[in-house]
């Protein structure tokens, strides 16, 4: 089983586009098949100030993982600790999950 860690923010337009275009449906299928599980971390930027309520509810863990991976933009996805370029789309994402599961 692969671990996916996704970084996002409630005011991030590209994050919403990613979710609606392929991420939500693809991850639901992979979770239901037992291929992956995922954790979502909310960063405090790009919105001015710290206004993302999901970030504020778990600031310590969100900030720790963001800094651990050096995440400096959102959307950002890690698969088994390796950065995944979200431009790879659903096919690239599924292939990365399957590759991670075969190791």
For every predicted segment, state its role:
Residues 25, 33, 38-66:
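Extended polysaccharide-engagement surfaces of secreted carbohydrate-active enzymes
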Residues 1-44:
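Local sequence-structure signature of Cys/Sec-based thiol-disulfide redox active-site neighborhoods
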Residues 2-3, 34-39, 52, 73-75, ...:
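Generic structural motif recognizing short loop/turn segments at the entrances and edges of beta-strands
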Residues 14-16, 48-50, 86-89:
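Extracytoplasmic/secreted cell-surface and envelope-processing proteins
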Residues 56-57, 64, 69-103:
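Non-catalytic, surface beta->alpha helical segment in thiol-disulfide oxidoreductase systems
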């Amino acid at each position: 089983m692969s671990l996916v860690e996704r970084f996002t923010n409630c005011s991030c337009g590209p994050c919403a586009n990613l979710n609606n275009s392929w991420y939500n449906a693809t991850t639901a299928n992979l979770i239901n098949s037992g291929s992956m599980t995922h954790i979502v971390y909310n960063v405090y930027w790009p919105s001015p100030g710290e206004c993302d309520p999901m970030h504020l509810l778990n600031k310590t863990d969100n900030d720790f993982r963001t800094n651990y991976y050096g995440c400096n933009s959102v959307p950002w996805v890690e698969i088994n600790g390796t950065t995944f370029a979200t431009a790879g789309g659903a096919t690239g994402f599924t292939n990365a999950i399957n590759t991670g599961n075969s190791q």
